[in-house]
Amino acid sequence: TRELELGDDHDGIIELPAEAPVGSDFADYASLNDPVIDLSITPNRQDCMGVRGIARDLAAKGVGTLKPLRSVYRMPAAPLPTDGPDPDVATLDPEGCPAFYGQEVRGVKNGTAPDWMARNLKAIGQKPISCLVDITNFVMIDLGRPLHVYDKAKLSGGLVARKAKAGEQVLALNGKTYTLDEGMTVIADSAHVHDIGGIMGGEDSGVSEATTDVVVECAYF
């Protein structure tokens, strides 16, 4: 699967189920034949940084029909996680982070994203990671609104956007430790720096399969 960019497994030949049509193109069978459109967005069209913004623009020109948002997001029949109390979030760096919002969600279950979501992410070069992370990436690509998700249990108090202190360090999600300076905007709680604002999240508050409560961040850097 690694050679075909279908996953990280590299143990041997992929065995297809018995009902797979013999002689058919594998790309057609595995739904890997969707066209990929590569766009270069000019600075004045930030509304087209997501798929929906592009679709809205095309629909306005008579190319296709813009689907209602509710028909795009497939809501499950099972009970949804519940919203928790509003988390304590604030920005002390109005220049680097003019807007900083958060929403606590309780009772989530992390795991593998649905196949349809994983396929959509892979089609545009995004590697599926986990359900919670994949949802934030899907929303970002669809609506053009970057999000970040924290494991609530790994936070100490509220979250604040502020300037970094000289010499502060953060272990990022890519496994590297970065030393910060006063010109950088970070997201921190009372104990740790958790994000380099608008660039990369931190490992200390990353979600895992054991995560049950999260804080979803929506910020403007």
Predicted feature residues:
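Structured core elements
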Residues: V36-S40, G50, D57, G102-E104, ...
